[in-house]
Design a protein with these regions (language model features):
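A Rossmann-like FAD-binding core segment of flavoenzymes
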Residues: 48-137
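Rossmann-like NAD(P)H-binding beta-loop-alpha module
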Residues: 13, 17-66, 100
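Rossmann-fold NAD(P)-binding glycine/threonine-rich loop
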Residues: 2-3, 12-14
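Phosphate-coordination loops involved in phosphoryl transfer and adenosine-cofactor binding
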Residues: 3, 24-29, 88, 97
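Gly/Ser/Thr-rich helix-start
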Residues: 1, 37-40, 122, 134
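Conserved beta-strand scaffold positions in the cores of enzyme catalytic domains, especially
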Residues: 6-8, 85-86
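Conserved SAM-binding loop
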Residues: 7-8, 32, 55, 118
């Protein structure tokens, strides 16, 4: 989908586009698709700007590599800061509505936001470290 309200987050330039949109349009709500390190960081920054944030994550926990006990602690902290969680839901698409975007979920009602950020499948760029002979985990 081509929409000025839908953002991917893979590069520094993507961050600048998100910041420009927030400064210019003053969104009241955002849906973050992805609950890994980057998704949580962006959700935190958007909340600090007073934006209502919902994180949608296909696995039933944030920070999927963590064990369930640690994830439970993270869920509690995130909720304490006003972030809503929609865990265990698959995103099937997006639809423009009411000046924002609906995030269409499989077998669930859609979630509406003034903007949507996709922070999924992001892995660190490690080519330079690998070429330098550094050990990678």
């Amino acid at each position: 989908m081509d929409s000025d309200k839908l953002f991917t987050l893979r590069t520094v330039e993507d961050t600048f586009r998100i910041k420009e949109f927030v400064d210019e349009h003053k969104p009241k709500s955002a849906v973050m698709v992805g609950g890994g390190f980057i998704g949580l960081e962006v959700a935190e920054n958007l909340r600090e700007l007073g934006i209502d944030v919902t994180i949608v994550q296909r696995p039933k926990q944030l920070m999927n590599p963590f064990d369930a006990d640690m994830a439970s602690f993270i869920h509690s902290e995130v909720r304490k800061h006003g972030v809503k969680l929609a865990l265990g839901y698959s995103v099937e698409g997006f639809a423009e509505r009411d000046g924002g975007l609906d995030v269409l979920l499989k077998d669930q009602p859609s979630i509406h936001g003034d903007m949507v950020v996709l922070a999924i499948g992001v892995t660190p760029e490690s080519t330079l470290a690998r070429d330098a002979g550094l050990a990678l985990g």
